[in-house]
């Protein structure tokens, strides 16, 4: 389920990561200059460690030619189930034309590691949710939702399903950058081609699949062991939107003796929670969205424009202006290269062996072991305050 085989809340796991990340990562040995500076490729200097997990570690880096900061993801070459090259391949498949995707600058060996150099982004929606006292206004959620429907439509247009919806995987741009207001989608380690590249046909419907995704947000059909398709990404987004509006979901914090029992309880609670109850006291459009995506057929192409219009029409009816004045605008946001105060004016201008996770599972054997952090979240903007318990 999460990149973790231990059933813990996302925030609990992240807390543990912060305490342990300096002891569980081996030191990568890459190309060093005569002065001992570690390099990736010809021009990326490897800096401080800002995250780690079973995949390897994450480093802040710098492009010595442009003086720009970057994120460097390192994975041992001898990993039993390497995923970094697959993720790189998916990024290349997605291309650089789509809005809200990090640029990938380099992939190649770095001593005993493979390295992927990515655009350095800002904090995740989970970080920003914490910063805003764990509640977002309807305006902010709608601005997020409208963008993420376009992100997911683009991913699907490239014959990929994402299968990893969670707030930690959606990041804003770096402050001061022209894309600072754009919600980006990252971490394609669990993505999958739903169109067979050989036959050009949709993958077949299957059952008895192991869980892939994050339990809190994944679709009901994923809990039931059904093969995922485009509909499941959209349902998971709907659950995340309600998480932002409500502050929590009814299936959070359930207790059980085993992981399997807990995941079963989460799925059972999702199925038994009427959409009307989940969306109570919120606009009817939230119910309409969830009803629509849950009724989609496995092979069916969602009507993304219909869903976007649900939210844009509501947005306009409420009299909102799409000015990117999110709830976090005006609050200081720590980043790996210093704390930045978000100015409101400036902001307005502008693979098949995964098992369970309540953050995503990472491997088999690697993907099914605990991954102790949300990868780029730490790279791109580790907040200094500890997560609150849930």
Swiss-Prot record:
PTM note: Autophosphorylated.
Cell location: Cytoplasm
Ranges annotated as biased composition (Basic and acidic residues): 1-13
Transmembrane segments annotated in the record for this chain: none
UniProt-listed Enzyme Commission number(s): 2.7.11.1
Pfam families reported for this sequence: CK1gamma_C, Pkinase
Catalytic-site annotation from UniProt: 164 (proton acceptor)
SMART domains from the UniProt entry: S_TKc (SM00220)
Swiss-Prot/TrEMBL GO biological process terms: endocytosis; positive regulation of canonical Wnt signaling pathway; signal transduction; Wnt signaling pathway
Lineage: superkingdom: Eukaryota
GO CC terms in record: cytoplasm; nucleus; plasma membrane
Molecular function GO labels: ATP binding; protein serine kinase activity; protein serine/threonine kinase activity
Keyword Kinase recorded: yes
Stored CDD domains: STKc_CK1_gamma
Keyword annotations: ATP-binding, Cytoplasm, Kinase, Nucleotide-binding, Phosphoprotein, Serine/threonine-protein kinase, Transferase, Wnt signaling pathway
UniProt binding sites for ATP: 50-58, 73
InterPro entries associated with the record: Casein_kinase-1_gamma_C (IPR022247), CK1_Ser-Thr_kinase (IPR050235), Kinase-like_dom_sf (IPR011009), Prot_kinase_dom (IPR000719), Protein_kinase_ATP_BS (IPR017441), Ser/Thr_kinase_AS (IPR008271)
Residue intervals of the Protein kinase domain: 44-315
Reaction equations catalysed: L-seryl-[protein] + ATP = O-phospho-L-seryl-[protein] + ADP + H(+); L-threonyl-[protein] + ATP = O-phospho-L-threonyl-[protein] + ADP + H(+)
Modification Phosphoserine occurs at: 344
Subunit structure: Monomer.
Function in brief: Serine/threonine-protein kinase. Casein kinases are operationally defined by their preferential utilization of acidic proteins such as caseins as substrates. It can phosphorylate a large number of proteins. Participates in Wnt signaling. Regulates fast synaptic transmission mediated by glutamate. Phosphorylates CLSPN.
Protein name: Casein kinase I isoform gamma-1
Lineage: Eukaryota, Metazoa, Chordata, Craniata, Vertebrata
Designated gene of the protein: Csnk1g1
């Amino acid at each position: 389920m999460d990149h973790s085989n231990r059933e813990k809340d996302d925030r609990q796991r992240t807390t543990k990561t912060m305490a342990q990340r300096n002891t569980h990562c081996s030191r990568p040995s890459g190309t060093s200059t005569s002065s001992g500076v570690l390099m990736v490729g010809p021009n990326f200097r490897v800096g401080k460690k800002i995250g780690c997990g079973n995949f390897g570690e994450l480093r802040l880096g710098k492009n010595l030619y442009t003086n720009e900061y970057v994120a460097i993801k390192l994975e041992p070459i001898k990993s039993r189930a390497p995923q970094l090259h697959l993720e790189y391949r998916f990024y290349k498949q997605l291309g650089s034309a789509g809005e809200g995707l990090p640029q990938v600058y380099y992939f190649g060996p770095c001593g005993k590691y493979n390295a992927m150099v990515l655009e350095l982004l800002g904090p995740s929606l989970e970080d920003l949710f914490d910063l805003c006292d764990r509640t977002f206004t309807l305006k902010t959620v709608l601005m997020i939702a409208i963008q993420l429907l376009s992100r997911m439509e683009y991913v699907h247009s490239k014959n990929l399903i994402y299968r990893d919806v969670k707030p930690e995987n959606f990041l804003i741009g770096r402050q001061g950058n022209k894309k600072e207001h754009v919600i980006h989608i990252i971490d394609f380690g669990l993505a999958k081609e739903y169109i067979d590249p050989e036959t050009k046909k949709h993958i077949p419907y299957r059952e008895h699949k192991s869980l892939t995704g994050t339990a809190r947000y994944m679709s009901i059909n994923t809990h039931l062991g059904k093969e995922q398709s485009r509909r499941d990404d959209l349902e998971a987004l709907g659950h995340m939107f309600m998480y932002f509006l409500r502050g929590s979901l009814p299936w959070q914090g359930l207790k059980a003796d085993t992981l399997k029992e807990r995941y079963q309880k989460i799925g059972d609670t999702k199925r038994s929670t009427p959409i009307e109850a989940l969306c109570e006291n919120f606009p009817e459009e939230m119910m309409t969205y969830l009803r629509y995506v849950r009724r989609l057929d496995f092979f069916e192409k969602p009507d993304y424009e219909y869903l976007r219009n649900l939210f844009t029409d509501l947005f306009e009816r409420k009299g909102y202006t799409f000015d990117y004045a999110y709830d976090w605008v005006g609050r200081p946001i720590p980043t790996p290269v210093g704390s930045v105060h978000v100015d409101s004016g400036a902001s307005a201008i502008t693979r098949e062996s995964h098992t369970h996770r309540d953050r995503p599972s990472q491997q088999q054997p690697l993907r099914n072991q605990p991954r102790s952090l949300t990868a780029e979240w730490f790279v791109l903007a580790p907040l200094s305050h500890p997560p609150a318990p849930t």
